[in-house]
From Swiss-Prot:
Organism from which the protein derives: Neurospora crassa (strain ATCC 24698 / 74-OR23-1A / CBS 708.71 / DSM 1257 / FGSC 987)
Translocase as UniProt keyword: yes
Lineage: Eukaryota, Fungi, Dikarya, Ascomycota, Pezizomycotina
Name of the protein in question: Cytochrome c oxidase subunit 3
Family statement drawn from the similarity comment of this UniProt entry: Belongs to the cytochrome c oxidase subunit 3 family.
Reaction(s) catalysed by this chain's protein: 4 Fe(II)-[cytochrome c] + O2 + 8 H(+)(in) = 4 Fe(III)-[cytochrome c] + 2 H2O + 4 H(+)(out)
One Pfam family in the UniProt entry: COX3
Enzyme class: translocase
Length: 269
């Protein structure tokens, strides 16, 4: 006869999360990371050591947080259909909030570009600024990023069809293209004739493209975790919320880059 304890069961499909230190840990590390990053730009002595400590702490907290979520969803069965719907809604709302953030960035760019002040020479780009040629490295990066969107879509459809090998190859191709894109973006910054300190043009250019680059790095980590989970047989054809969230996020990154290329690189030059 099985001895069942009523307190071990629940009469609802939702996941009541246990107390976790990782949200607070991650928040503190993010605060230290942004603070030390800002201070390092003002030449505070040895502040970069604290920056690296905060970065290591953030990566460690993310790893441990991912570990707990994977255990809850894959091995403990806490991610029911109701929980999956909630997670999908949370991902969508997060992407909407990010879209509004980029809207503010584009607003700042067009405000400066459409009504250039006397200090900028009453023209855009300002006098003395040589903008990046949109038909060179930016165009190549556009092709690379759009190609990565196609490969991750292929991986998604392969996983739905139960073709694990196709999902692995598609995800690997996407991550490689993302790394190449990030590398080319770094090359573009290193050879640029202007900096973030060169007035409104430099600030808008580097802030918009740099913030997008941060999102590319975050999306790459997102997809790398999903790739490992596919390799470890964690994901199935009907239970892969994390992978779908990473794909939605990646398509959002693609769309934002198209707007950046058209407005900042092409029209803005």
């Amino acid at each position: 006869m099985t001895n069942l304890i009523r307190s071990n069961f629940q009469d609802h499909p939702f996941h009541l999360v246990s107390p976790s230190p990782w949200p607070l840990n991650t928040s503190v590390c993010l605060l230290n990371l942004t603070t030390t990053g800002a201070l390092s730009m003002h030449n505070f002595n040895n502040i970069h050591y604290l920056y690296y400590i905060a970065l290591i702490g953030l990566v460690s907290a993310m790893f441990l947080w991912f570990r707990d979520i994977i255990s809850e969803g894959t091995f403990l069965g806490d991610h029911t259909l109701a929980v999956q719907r909630g997670l999908n809604l949370g991902i969508i709302l997060f992407i909407v909030s990010e879209a509004l953030f980029f809207l503010a960035i584009f607003w700042a760019f067009f405000h400066s570009a459409l009504t250039p002040t006397v200090e900028l020479g009453a023209q855009w780009p300002p006098i003395g600024i040589e903008p990046v040629n949109p038909f060179e490295l930016p165009l190549l990066n556009t092709v690379i990023l759009l190609s990565s969107g196609a490969t991750i879509t292929y991986a998604h459809h392969a996983l739905i069809k139960g073709e694990r090998e196709g999902a692995l190859y598609g995800s690997i191709a996407t991550i490689l293209l993302a790394i190449i894109f990030t590398g080319f973006q770094g090359v573009e910054y290193s050879v640029s004739s202007f900096t973030i300190s060169d007035g409104a043009f430099g600030t808008c250019f580097f802030f918009s493209t740099g913030f997008h680059g941060i999102h590319v790095i975050i999306g790459t980590i997102f997809l790398a975790v999903a790739l490992w989970r596919i390799f470890a047989y964690h994901l199935t054809d009907n239970h892969h919320v994390g992978f779908e969230g990473g794909i939605l996020y990646w398509h959002f990154v693609d769309v934002v880059w198209l707007f950046l290329y058209i407005s900042v690189y092409y029209w803005g030059s």
